[in-house]
């Protein structure tokens, strides 16, 4: 048995524990998550609906790679999405009051990388295949799973906005999940032990 001893400070935290931004990023990099792209419509108001793949000339699909989301409730089906206050996606989600969640599979690494930057000039959504839900939300074809969400509440916390959304439509796709760990993308190494 190994015992670890820490010397406490006034706040009760071990002296070896720091609270610097870089340190907390390192901690969170060890938390393995799935990878999703959050999709919204930019422009409008006329969008494709009912599975059509045609957008009005005044609209385009906007995406943001995310792993800061989680299930909140199963009945009703609610989820939580955290978006930085300076992100373009934040404004688009607030404006449209809905968004799509596309869980990516291992064959969609390029999609994850494409939408992982906050610089919209680097997004290449035109070459990707999309389909649209009955409610007009864009979804990335070939994803592992899809959720069409309607925002029911949102609030600002520090440098992020927390969106609580109801999953109004959802569908399973196929493939193996793309995973994010230590600031990199990978797949699962499934072993039959």
Predicted regions and their residues:
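Basic, polyanion-binding surface patches
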Residues: 2-193
């Amino acid at each position: 048995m190994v015992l670890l001893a820490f010397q406490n400070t006034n706040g009760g935290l071990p002296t070896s524990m720091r609270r610097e931004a870089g340190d907390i990023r390192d901690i969170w990099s060890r938390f393995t998550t799935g990878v999703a792209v959050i999709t919204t419509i930019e422009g409008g108001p006329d969008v494709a609906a009912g599975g059509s793949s045609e957008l009005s000339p005044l609209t385009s699909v906007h995406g943001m790679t995310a792993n800061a989301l989680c299930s909140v409730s199963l009945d009703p089906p609610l989820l939580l999405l955290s978006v930085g206050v300076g992100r373009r996606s934040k404004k688009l989600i607030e404006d449209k009051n809905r968004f799509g969640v596309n869980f990516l599979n291992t064959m969609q690494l390029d999609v994850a990388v494409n939408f992982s930057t906050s610089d919209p000039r680097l997004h290449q959504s035109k070459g990707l295949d999309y389909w649209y839900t009955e409610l007009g939300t864009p979804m990335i074809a070939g994803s592992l799973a899809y959720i069409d969400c309607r925002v029911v509440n949102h609030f600002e916390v520090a440098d992020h906005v927390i969106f609580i959304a109801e999953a109004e439509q959802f569908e399973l796709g196929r493939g193996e999940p793309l995973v994010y760990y230590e600031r990199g993308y990978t797949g699962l190494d499934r072993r039959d032990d």
